[in-house]
Amino acid sequence: MSMMKEFREFAMRGNVVDLAVGVIIGAAFGKIVSSFVADIIMPPLGLLIGGVDFKQFHLVLREAQGAVPAVVMNYGSFIQTIFDFVIVAFAIFLAIKLMNKVRRKQEEAPAAPPAPTAEEKLLTEIRDLLSQQQQPKL
């Protein structure tokens, strides 16, 4: 088997394709959540706090000296990233909760009783014949 054929079989397996689709959708969802947090959630939150832009929160560790830029810890961006994470984690939690609910409903559905085996059918016939023989003849 050639290496290309093996690779094609590997790449076209259901799990690999599903994983690739999940990664692509996850990346797009991450961008949507980042925009939602940065453009929708943080501005009103900053306004409630007093017109603050969280991205501008920083701590200067060392001032700029000539051509050397200042060393700055941007904790405002970190706070915004935490909001991103919490929203993504909550969305994943809701999705998994929904999937588990659907799975439980499928498991709760009663399974059809199994068809009688050949042995059970034969025993049923024998029982019926014996009961017919024991009935009084009219």
Curated annotation (Swiss-Prot):
It is found in: Cell inner membrane. Keywords: Cell inner membrane, Cell membrane, Ion channel, Ion transport, Membrane, Transmembrane, Transmembrane helix, Transport. Channel that opens in response to stretch forces in the membrane lipid bilayer. May participate in the regulation of osmotic pressure changes within the cell. GO terms for molecular function: mechanosensitive monoatomic ion channel activity. Homopentamer. Its main location: membrane. It is a multi-pass membrane protein. SUPFAM superfamilies: Gated mechanosensitive channel. Belongs to the MscL family. It comes from Serratia proteamaculans (strain 568). Pfam families: MscL. It comes from the Bacteria. This is Large-conductance mechanosensitive channel. The chain crosses the membrane at residues 10-30, 76-96. Signal peptide: none annotated. The keyword Transport applies. One of its GO terms (cellular component) is plasma membrane.
